[in-house]
Amino acid sequence: HFGGVRGIITEAEVQAGTVQVIAPTGFMEEAISENVYAGNAMSRRAGLQYGRVIPSSPFGQVDSAIGKGLAVGTTGLIAPTLVIEDDFEEHIIDGVRIIFQNTPGTEAPAEMNAWFPQQKVFWAAENITATIHNIYTLRGALIRDALVWSKQINEALYRYGVQAEVMVSSHNWPRWGNERIQEIMRAQRDAYANLNNQVLNLANQGVTINEIHNEYEVPLSLQQQWNVRQYHGSEFHNSRAVINRYLGYWDGNPATLAPLSPADSAPLYVEMMGGADAILDRAQALHDGGQYRLAMEILNKLVYAEPNNSGGKDLLAAVFEQLGYQYESASMRNVFLSSA
C-alpha cells in the first residue's frame, strides 16, 4: 500500500531530510514479495475483484467496499527513512508525540497502528475499516491470520481505544466519540475471532475447505452491526481462508489430490450428461428456477469442454450476472459481473 507516495512528497524532500517516511518493520521486503513476485497474476485478478472492466451502474460496478474503485495513475515507491522495529515505539515528529504499534500478520504482513496521545486520535491503519476485511483477498495475497488480527485489535482497544476520541483509518470515514469507537473495535475484534474459532471448530468436526463456506454462519449479534457486514471480505472466501491457513488447500479426498485439469476432465462430464444440448436445456431450467449455483456447476463443465460453444458461454454469463447481484460483498459481486 505505497503506490501514491509520490503524489504527496518528492524524493528530493526525503533526501534533504525535510520529510520522513515511516514504515513498519519488514515493509520493503513484503512490498516486493506481494506486488512483484506474483505481480502479473495479481494484477489480472485485481481487475476482477475491483470490477475494472465493467461500467459503473446499478447493473455493473457500484463499489469496491473500502473505496469507490481503483485509482488510476503512476505508481511509486520511496524507501522508509524510519523503520518501526519494536512492538510499541514512541517518536516525536514535528512536535507531535506518536506511539506506533506494529501489527504484523493482520491486514498485511507488515502493518502498524498509531496513537496520538495529545490529540486522543487513534490511527487504525487498515486493521479496522467500515466492513469485515479479507482474510483471503480475491486478487491474490498471502492468507492472513484472523486470530492474530483479533488479538491486535484487542491490544489496541485496551491501550488506546479506551482513551480515543477520534478513530481514523486508511479507508472509509472517521469515528467520533469514545463509546462508538470502543463499540466498533469490539465488534471487529469479535468478528475475526469468531471466524477463526468457529471455522476451526467445524474443521475439527470434519467440515472441509470445499464445504466450510456453506456451513459457517456469522453470529446474529455481529450480522446486526453495520461495521462488520460483508462488504469487502465475505464469510464465503474468508471461511475457506482460515482452513487454508491451518490445513492447506487439500480437502482430504484422494480424488482431489492430483486431479485432471478442468479442460481434460470436462469432456467426459459433458458426454455423461448427454451432450451440450441436454446441458443447455437443464441449465436454462435451473437458471429460470433461480438455482444459479447448480446451473453454474454444469455450464462450467460445458464451457471447459467446448470453449467455442457460444450458447453455453452466454448462459453461464447470465448465471454469473444473477449470482453477482445477490452477494453483499463488492469483491464477490465484481468478480461475477466481470466474468460475465
Regions found by a protein language model. Name each.
Residues V14, L70-H133, R139-L147:
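Catalytic core of the metallo-beta-lactamase
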